Regions:
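Extracellular/periplasmic solute-recognition and catalytic clefts
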Residues: 132-135, 148, 201-212, 229-287, ...
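Ligand-site clamp/hinge motif
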Residues: 102, 186, 215-261, 297, ...
Length: 529
């Protein structure tokens, strides 16, 4: 019998103790935390949205069954702690995950939280509920979930078709919040109700999202803040000025602009961290001429990743594959292994020469170039690398014209594959292969924007997912990485490192190294003023 995950390791118990009761260090209650948001979310429906902006703004409204410790920088199985669940245990065969639940927790409208709410949530996510989600971007996470059953009001069991040791990590994602049975998905888009530390007040599109303290929160003494306001400022330079003027307390900025912040406000605390977001080339494999494998590979081999990093990340980005690069990423490949992948050879001219040869065999050349639209989302983290991509594709006889898509239309457009090629950002709700592979590369997944489908490789997805030995699993993951690169499934360009700054009075908020959303519960954050 393969080893099964323990109910809760000693490390998990220690982390749980930390999360449940951070030692008092003269935390001051009260105050309004003003957080910069880079875009206006389509809604605050956590189960339906895919972007970081709604996730960041809404995570504090909800609770998970389990979550990643808010004060451990790297998300991993070892940093998962209880939340609405008080613990978890696996059956001997590794197919049943049972979680006892906290008693006495209330929804923001005063109704009791029970195991029925957990079942309702995952029935929604798997399409079994009578009501349906408008979008279900994470349905692919739960392809191995057969059923969810309840044992009274205070216990729930997830029944799996096969062992999946990392299933708990999917439940810990900031996206894996629990919804109330008694509130419809449509109402959750307009006025989300949770059990979390903050209650929803209002959402003014393109202006702000406002949350207020939940006075009946089940974690005694939390949250410290009276309210949180997410100020929507799309232009990074404008956001910088607002931060320097003290109008916002926390901002996501660029590395060059961070230097201006430190110069103008030297007491500011700034941190550069990766966060696990890749810039990648999406190619509609069903749209000629991109249904040709050599065409897709030629485009992948044209990429000068170092130039992207130098321009966009001030030289501080990372080169990697599907999984976030080491050391911040848990499952990334060593650099010497990455260099062996197609298009990753450090000899750029060799790569491009081979790519031009492929294109010429397809009938393209200096006198017969391919003209097309390159789509991307209308915010700087997408637009800026898209301009560089268009310039680099010229090296392989492709002339691109930038087509800008507003945020509200971006995800629906790429989900229905209404494009030829595009510049995309992909972030994982979890730094785990089960999330990345099934969500972005499995046949029929809503977020498989390129239409990639390889049933034989999916069998390998299942093998790595069921493997309990971490070393053996990594070897399978890297084998999958090689095949995805060879197939040009979704060429990864580079991983950015983001710059985050906060005012010195903001205390007890940890930026995570392999997630940009999982640290936004904010129940432990306080203001020293």
């Amino acid at each position: 019998m393969k080893p099964r995950p323990p109910r809760l390791t000693m490390a998990g118990l220690l982390l749980a103790a930390i999360a449940g009761g951070t030692p008092a260090l003269a935390q001051k209650p009260g105050g309004v935390l003003r957080v910069h948001a880079i875009d206006s979310p389509p809604s605050l429906s956590m189960l339906e949205e895919v972007d970081a902006n709604p996730a960041r703004a809404a995570m504090g409204i909800f609770n998970n069954l389990v979550m990643f410790n808010q004060h451990v920088k790297q998300n991993s199985m070892a940093s998962i702690v209880p939340d609405l669940a008080t613990g978890w245990s696996w059956s001997e065969d590794g197919r049943q995950l049972t979680l006892p639940l906290r008693h006495g927790v209330k929804w923001h409208d005063g109704k009791p939280f029970t195991a029925a709410d957990v079942k309702c949530t995952w029935d929604l996510l798997t399409g079994k509920a009578s009501e349906k989600l408008r979008l279900d971007p994470r349905k692919s996470w739960y392809g191995n979930l057969a059923d969810v059953t309840t044992n009274g009001d205070d216990e729930v069991t997830f029944h799996l078709n096969r062992p999946q040791p990392a299933f708990v990590s999917l439940l810990a994602s900031g996206f894996s919040v629990v919804y109330p049975c008694h509130v419809s998905p449509a109402e959750m888009r307009r006025h989300p109700i949770g059990t979390g530390p903050f209650e929803f007040v209002e959402f003014k599109p393109n202006e702000r999202v406002t949350l207020t303290r939940n006075p009946n929160y089940w974690k005694q003494g939390r949250p410290y803040l009276n309210s949180v306001e997410f100020e929507i400022i799309r232009d990074p330079a404008t956001a910088n000025l607002a931060f320097i003027a003290g109008k916002v307390d926390w901002t996501a900025t660029t590395l060059p602009l961070m230097k201006a912040v430190k110069s103008e406000a030297p007491d500011t605390i700034c941190e550069v961290t990766p966060g696990g977001i890749s810039r990648n080339l999406i190619i509609n494999r069903d749209a000629p001429p991109f249904d040709n494998a050599d065409m897709r590979l030629a485009m992948a081999m044209s990429l000068d990743r170092k130039t992207f990093i130098d321009i966009i990340s001030d030289g501080q980005g990372d080169i990697g594959g599907v999984m976030q690069p080491l050391p911040e990423g848990v499952w990334g490949m060593p650099l010497d292994v990455i260099k062996m992948l197609p298009g990753y050879d450090p000899d750029l001219q060799k790569n491009r020469s081979e790519a031009r040869g492929m294109m010429q065999k397809l009938g393209y050349g200096p006198d017969k170039r391919l003209a097309l639209k390159v789509i991307t989302r209308n915010i700087p983290p997408y637009r800026d690398p898209a301009v560089i991509l268009i310039d680099q594709l010229k090296e392989v006889f492709i002339d691109g014209e930038l087509e800008i898509v507003e945020t509200a239309s971006w995800f629906p457009k790429v989900m229905r594959k209404d494009y030829k090629i595009g510049l995309n950002l992909t972030g994982g709700g979890v730094d785990d292969p089960d999330q990345q592979f099934y969500e972005n590369y499995a046949c029929g997944s809503p977020r498989n924007y390129t239409g990639y489908c390889n049933p034989e490789l999916e069998q390998l997805f299942d093998r790595q997912s069921a493997e309990a030995d971490e070393g053996k699993r990594k070897n399978l993951v890297w084998e999958i990485e090689r095949k995805l690169a060879e197939d040009g499934a979704r060429p990864i360009i580079f991983y950015n490192r983001g710059a985050y700054c906060w005012q010195p009075q903001v205390k007890n908020w940890t930026m995570m190294a392999n997630s940009i959303i999982n640290n936004f519960r904010m129940e432990d954050v306080w203001l020293d003023k």
